[in-house]
Amino acid sequence: MFATVRRYEGIDASDKAELTKKVSESLAPRLSKLPGFSSYFLIDTGNGVMSSIGLFDTSTQANESTRVASEWVRDEKLENILQNPPKVTEGEVIVHKMNGLVKA
């Protein structure tokens, strides 16, 4: 399993609700259709920072999710909300333990 972590900085508090809605309604469904998709999480870490974690079967699939997310930002015209490029980290998940998740 491979993870992609994207950290978005400089998000105005007044834009978080709109961004969250758009991610839920259009990005998450788009990512879930990618081959090898396992799960996706969007995290509000506070202070104008939001991070996402995507889990995929292979490194290539995880990398593709970053391309799809970048394309989505352009398609949704979110450059004004996401003014700074994300800091992207990808790698193999080497420890994983999960109990049942509660939907946010």
Residues of each region from the PLM?
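Short S/T/G/P-rich N-terminal loop/turn motif that feeds into the first structured element of a domain
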Residues: 1-51, 57-71, 78-104
